[in-house]
Amino acid sequence: LANRVFADEGFLDAAREFALKVASKAPFSMQLAKEQLNLSAERTLDACLTAELEGMMFVGTTKDWQEGVDAFAEKRAPIFKGE
């Protein structure tokens, strides 16, 4: 699955910028998104939606989720710790 195309010129800078953006996200959320994507070809839509809901319910119990809410309310960048 590809979601970006970069020109040869500036490729490394663009790829690095994209990687840093992904790395700044909450680890549990990114891990669950990757797992969902990898398993989606083997599941029905209903099974995918159920698993996504379960993942969202789990993520909502983490310290990183609260950090995201707090950071949004305080208009600052979140600092995720994988907790």
Residue ranges and their predicted role:
Residues 2-50, 80-83:
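C-terminal long alpha-helix characteristic of the crotonase
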Residues 27, 68-69:
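Helix-centric, low-specificity signal for extended rod-like, repetitive segments
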Residues 33-36, 56, 72:
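Short alpha-helical scaffolding segments that buttress acidic/His motifs in well-ordered protein cores
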Residues 64-65, 71:
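Interdomain hinge/lid region at the active-site interface
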